[in-house]
């Protein structure tokens, strides 16, 4: 089993790099160079290729092998990072990212989305039923670790680590990962998948997906359960930067510290569900408790933000406000990790109610909605903050975080 899990761990770690780069590192660097919250937030629109995974997933499934697609996409990611290394970084006073840089970041997300489909397909084919538990743990932990290394980890070394050196380092990492994907013995033993003789017609696919019991409720829940958390999580570090926190400190706490807490939360959620997995209601019961705690944590974070605007409030080293703000970042990530693990378990349970031939597509459909629910608030948070001000913006995030708590009362009986 170690011969399978070790290469998967390395590949999932590499898969988390683009997310950490664009969710943690770039926003703080761009804000430090004077870009508005609106423009910083809108750069997350570059995640758009991730929402189109269902468009090329059939191609990855039917043409070639997952190993070929995985190697090809990883090599392309290294090439894009190499091109980014030769371009000048965003300069202070610019109104936004240069068009060429935006285009390459869009290609980076396209390659990462193709890599995601290929790697998930490979994991499904590679792992035996008894290996799914350890395999899923490796997936979550390695992905979040890669995100932390590319986000907070690299940010800690700025400005020592220059823009060209950053992307040259990522280029070397991607090409090493591509060599790993091609040379790993366990991955080389996979055979070419057989193409199914029956392919659902596109016009009926959505109808078939929505006909699965519990899908409408699950789709609505996964679309909304992260909106408040994601909006606040993307905006709060930038506001701390505006109030005097250093970029390196935020990289350490918002990146590495928060990612460590998120991994711990995901691990705790998995352990709790594994201990009580015999009853399908357990994920919903866990969600009900943790979502209420998350709502309380966001209320405290909002109160901290309001207090920072009062005379005499400071984020200087050694102050209570500084410790409370950094603790708030980590606490929300920890609770968010538990919530994510429980929610993905609910998604899997719902997809298992679908016909076997539709289960993979059904799960991809729910995962795409889950991603959309995280991207929208992260992208629009800056626009809301610039237009409404941080106070009203965080009040809206509180309302959005309360909706999933109420939504759980409407869960259908086939999921409870």
Swiss-Prot record:
Keywords: Membrane, Transmembrane, Transmembrane helix, Transport. Coiled coil: none annotated. InterPro entries: AmpG_permease/AT-1, MFS, MFS_trans_sf. It comes from the Eukaryota. GO terms for cellular component: membrane. GO terms for molecular function: transmembrane transporter activity. The keyword ATP-binding does not apply. It is a multi-pass membrane protein. The keyword Transport applies. The chain crosses the membrane at residues 10-30, 40-60, 68-88, 99-119, 139-158, 170-190, 204-224, 252-272, 295-315, 324-344, 365-385, 392-412. It is found in: Membrane. CDD domains: MFS_MFSD3. It holds the Pfam family MFS_1. Belongs to the major facilitator superfamily. This is Major facilitator superfamily domain-containing protein 3. It comes from Rattus norvegicus. The gene is Mfsd3.
């Amino acid at each position: 089993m170690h011969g399978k899990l070790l290469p998967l761990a390395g590949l999932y770690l590499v898969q988390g790099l683009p997310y950490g780069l664009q969710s943690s590192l770039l926003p703080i660097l761009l804000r430090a160079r004077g870009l508005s919250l609106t423009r910083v937030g809108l750069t997350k629109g570059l995640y758009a290729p991730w929402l189109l995974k269902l468009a090329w997933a059939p191609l990855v499934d039917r043409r070639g092998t997952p190993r070929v697609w995985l190697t090809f996409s990883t090599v392309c990611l290294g090439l894009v990072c190499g091109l980014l290394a030769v371009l000048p970084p965003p300069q202070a006073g610019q109104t936004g990212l240069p068009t060429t840089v935006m285009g390459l970041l869009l290609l980076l997300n396209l390659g990462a989305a193709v890599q995601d489909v290929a790697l998930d397909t490979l994991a499904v084919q590679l792992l035996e039923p008894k290996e799914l538990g350890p395999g899923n743990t490796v997936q979550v932990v390695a992905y979040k670790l890669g995100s932390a290394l590319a986000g907070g980890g690299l940010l800690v070394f700025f400005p020592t680590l220059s823009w060209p050196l950053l992307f040259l380092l990522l280029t070397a990492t991607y090409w090493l990962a591509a060599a790993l994907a091609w040379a790993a013995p366990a991955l080389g033993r996979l055979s070419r998948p057989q193409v199914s003789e029956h392919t659902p017609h596109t016009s009926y696919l959505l109808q078939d997906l929505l006909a699965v019991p519990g899908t409408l409720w699950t789709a609505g829940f996964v679309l909304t359960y992260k909106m408040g958390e994601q909006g606040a999580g993307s905006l709060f570090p930038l506001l701390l930067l505006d109030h005097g926190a250093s970029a390196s400190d935020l990289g350490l706490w918002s990146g590495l510290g928060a990612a460590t807490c998120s991994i711990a939360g995901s691990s705790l959620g998995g352990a709790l569900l594994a201990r009580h997995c015999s009853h399908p209601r357990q994920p919903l019961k866990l969600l009900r408790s943790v979502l209420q705690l998350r709502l309380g944590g966001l209320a405290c974070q909002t109160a901290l933000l309001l207090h920072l605007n009062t005379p005499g409030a400071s984020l200087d080293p050694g102050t209570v406000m500084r410790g409370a703000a950094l603790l708030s970042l980590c606490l929300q990530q920890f609770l968010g990790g538990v919530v994510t693990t429980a929610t993905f378990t609910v998604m899997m349970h719902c997809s298992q109610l679908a016909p076997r031939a539709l289960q993979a597509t059904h799960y991809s459909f729910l995962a795409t909605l889950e991603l959309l629910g995280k991207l929208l608030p992260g992208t629009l948070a800056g626009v809301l903050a610039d237009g409404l001000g941080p106070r009203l913006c965080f009040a809206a995030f509180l309302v959005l975080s309360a909706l999933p708590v109420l939504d759980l009362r409407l869960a259908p009986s086939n999921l409870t």
